[in-house]
Amino acid sequence: MEFINVGDIVSVPFNVACGRCRTCRAGDTGVCLTVNPGLPGGAYGYVDMGGWIGGQARYVMTPYADFNLLKFPDRDQALAKIRDLTMLSDILPTGFHAAVKAQVGAGSIVYVAGCGPVGLAAAASARLLGAAVVMIGDMNKERLAHAKEVGFEPIDLNSHDRIGELIEAVIGEPVVDCFIDAVGFEAKGHGGAEQPAVVLNQAMDVTRYAGSIGIPGLYVTKDPGSHDKQSAKGALSLNFGLGWSKSQSFHTGQTPVLRYNRQLMQAILHDRIPIAKIVNAQVISLEDAPKGYVDFDKGEAVKFVLDPHGTVAKAA
């Protein structure tokens, strides 16, 4: 290790990447070819991602540290924004990657499916990229209320799931330029029934011809807990012919955090994106983590930040 010193404050991407293989050199650090003997891509504390010990602990070992770690340039400046900077490890780059891949730009009309932290980060990223309207849909009323409070257009899916009609009520037409799926395979249809493909099919339905769909939501190669035999094998019932006929673009996969985290750090340090407020970040101790998991699983409109050494709480 040559460039990181004792006492530096750094951000650790959730990806584990070597920095030397073909995909890393191309900037696709989410699918590093060398850090996982089972398949491309490594991550901390996640099944099938190379056996790297998770980061929700007092200490973590980071391989290839000079390549993977993002050092904050000024300690005092970083501590002043530390709650926001904690989001650089995962959800902010993930949301930004989704918005970029959905081709959000100046004047775009954007719909984000899912009002959790990643969905809110995607909505914030769309706004940063110049979107004219950012709608965000969910059935969780607490999360919808928070989304409205931080400046997004909430779409309440409790009444019905005809997304086009709900979008038309906001912008006057039932189509969007850019669609972001921040839900993934755990999606449920109206009424709460398991429908792993429902968001993807809605995306193809309401995204305009030649529009783009960014998919940060997780989809798996197999889902043993699914009640549907096809979904259990990772096979979804997609209306893909519709997407093909509309010349839509689809972008999936793990976010290559290193592609974006330095630029997003600058956006945070220079007050362009108050991401901690947007995702309602709440700092808790490592001892309180089990309760945090339970509360988050209940759908609370909070992004918990584990603070094992009290550094974040002291700075805030």
Map each language-model feature to its residues:
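A glycine-/small-residue-rich N-terminal strand-loop-strand element
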Residues: 1-16, 73-81
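NAD(P)H dinucleotide-binding glycine-rich loop of Rossmann-like/cofactor-binding domains
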Residues: 18-113
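Glycine-rich cofactor phosphate-binding loops and adjacent beta1-alpha1 units
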Residues: 102-104, 145-247, 290, 313-316
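N-terminal Rossmann-fold NAD(P) dinucleotide-binding loop
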Residues: 119-120
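Conserved S-adenosyl-L-methionine
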Residues: 128-133
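Conserved acidic E/D residue at the C-terminus of a beta-strand in Rossmann-like folds
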Residues: 138-139
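C-terminal hydrophobic helical "lid"/dimerization subdomain
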Residues: 160, 174, 191, 254-316
